[in-house]
UniProtKB/Swiss-Prot annotation:
Its main location: cytoplasm. The keyword ATP-binding does not apply. The lineage of its organism: Bacteria, Pseudomonadati, Pseudomonadota, Gammaproteobacteria, Enterobacterales. It comes from Klebsiella aerogenes (strain ATCC 13048 / DSM 30053 / CCUG 1429 / JCM 1235 / KCTC 2190 / NBRC 13534 / NCIMB 10102 / NCTC 10006 / CDC 819-56) (Enterobacter aerogenes). It is found in: Cytoplasm. It holds the Pfam family CheW. One of its GO terms (biological process) is signal transduction. The gene is cheW. This is Chemotaxis protein CheW. GO terms for cellular component: cytosol. PROSITE patterns: CHEW. InterPro entries: CheW, CheW-like_dom_sf, CheW-lke_dom.
Length: 166
């Protein structure tokens, strides 16, 4: 069994995990590339009454109603604007399709286990239970987000209801 653990550890070190890197304000975030379905420009959405501000509304994506969540609003960023760089990352996870609005997408990076540090005990813009960890790549520090934990089950129930009502 010890040999298997060593092989798994070595495989993790050489292969790494790929993250889509996106920006919110001045910070760089990473999300598991396997959860990303597509990246689109930001289009107007159909606003839904009585939903939190961070749920921008829904859009029709090839016949699928996709709730759109603005992470900038969810993370309480000031001065949120929509311009030509604003994009929607369409995610597919846990039998759900959800779009998240971000300031921009930069690249896809592969991080090895050694490059991923545990999340600190505190964070200013979001609670640490939403973090997978911090990715250290040279001078770059990437905040790695667990999107399923970020969108709590209560919020996902709300998102599901929004999608089903349209």
């Amino acid at each position: 069994m010890a040999g298997l653990a060593t092989v798994s550890k070595l495989a993790g070190e050489t292969v790494g995990q790929e993250f889509l890197i996106f920006t919110l304000g001045n910070e760089e975030y990473g999300i598991d590339i396997l959860k990303v379905q597509e990246i689109r420009g930001y289009d107007q959405v159909t606003r839904i009454a009585n939903t939190p501000d961070f749920i921008k509304g829904v859009t029709n994506l090839r016949g699928v109603i996709v709730p759109i969540i603005d992470l900038r609003v969810k993370f309480a960023q000031q001065g949120v604007s929509y311009d030509e760089n604003t994009v929607v990352i369409v995610l597919n996870f846990g039998q759900r399709v959800v779009g998240i609005v971000v300031d921009g997408v930069s690249d896809v990076l592969s991080l090895t286990a050694e490059q991923i540090r545990p999340a600190p005990e505190f964070a200013v813009t979001l609670a640490t239970e939403y973090l997978t960890g911090l990715g250290a790549l040279g001078e770059r520090m990437l905040i790695l987000v667990d999107i399923e934990k970020l969108l709590s089950s209560e919020e996902m129930a709300l998102v599901d209801n929004v999608a089903k009502s349209h």
